[in-house]
């Protein structure tokens, strides 16, 4: 038998063996997005000292931290339209807030492509993409959506949104109290001792807002830690790509809706 035919047989056997393995085991990585609303990079891993964020800091220490990550729009749905499609807002026609754009027929939200590749895709539970997402975007998109509901061995793409840090959590008394209800006394902030950004007026109202921002971040870090703990308990952590990011800067003046650093620079 000549070398050419031997090589063809060897390649065929290798391909057959690989195909057989693929049928019994899918070792493609899982992907988990952790997305808090309205959050600047006020974390220990970015040099913040006023609060402790151990779970996000541990992610950064064990992974890849971007120090100059910017979104292409400083407000939620406009930004999210780009993340879910991989295209600029001006390309999609989603650059005007609350415009309810219609996607070009050739554009697919990328979870559809993951589903076509065999992934179980869930969103828990914010969409707000500036357009009506096609029904086939997600296997599940609601407050119960979770990787636990996939088939055995099926790779997953799971999105978890934390709305507690939204600007309404700073401005709204009841929401702020609800989100921060489980904080320990040591995790509370004294508004009188906080260092404000230099562009804010030093008034009691501003200090209270900045205090609430910090405490909401602390609550979010605990929530993120719970997701990571669950991944480990389910034996998925080592084969999961975890991406932590926010849609834009903090929900305060000169941040959210602001086109410069404080509105567009995010933790990633």
Question: Residue spans of the language-model regions?
Answer:
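Bacterial N-terminal signal peptides
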Residues: 9-20
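Formylglycine-dependent sulfatase
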Residues: 2-4, 23-268
């Amino acid at each position: 038998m000549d070398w050419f035919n031997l090589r063809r047989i060897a390649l065929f056997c290798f391909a057959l063996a690989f195909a057989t393995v693929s049928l019994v085991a899918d070792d493609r990585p899982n992907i988990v997005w952790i997305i808090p609303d309205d959050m600047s990079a006020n974390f220990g891993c970015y040099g913040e000292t006023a609060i402790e964020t151990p779970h996000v800091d541990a992610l950064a220490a064990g992974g890849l931290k971007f120090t100059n990550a910017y979104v292409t729009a400083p407000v939620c749905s406009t930004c999210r339209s780009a993340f879910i499609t991989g295209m600029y807002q001006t390309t999609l026609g989603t650059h005007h807030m609350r415009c309810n754009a219609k996607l070009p027929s050739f554009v697919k939200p990328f979870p559809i492509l993951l589903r076509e590749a065999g992934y179980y895709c869930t969103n828990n539970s914010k969409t707000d993409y500036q357009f009506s997402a096609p029904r086939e975007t997600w296997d599940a998109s609601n407050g119960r959506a979770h990787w636990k509901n996939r088939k055995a061995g099926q790779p997953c793409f799971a999105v978890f949104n934390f709305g507690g840090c939204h600007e309404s959590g700073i401005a709204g008394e009841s929401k702020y109290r609800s989100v921060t209800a489980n904080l320990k006394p040591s995790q509370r902030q004294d508004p009188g001792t906080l260092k404000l950004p230099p562009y804010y007026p030093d008034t009691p109202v501003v200090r209270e807002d900045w205090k609430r921002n910090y405490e909401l971040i602390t609550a979010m870090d605990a929530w993120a830690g719970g997701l990571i703990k669950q991944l480990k308990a389910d034996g998925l952590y080592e084969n999961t790509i975890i991406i932590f990011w926010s849609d834009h800067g903090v929900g305060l003046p000169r941040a959210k809706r602001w086109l410069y650093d404080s509105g567009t620079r995010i933790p990633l």
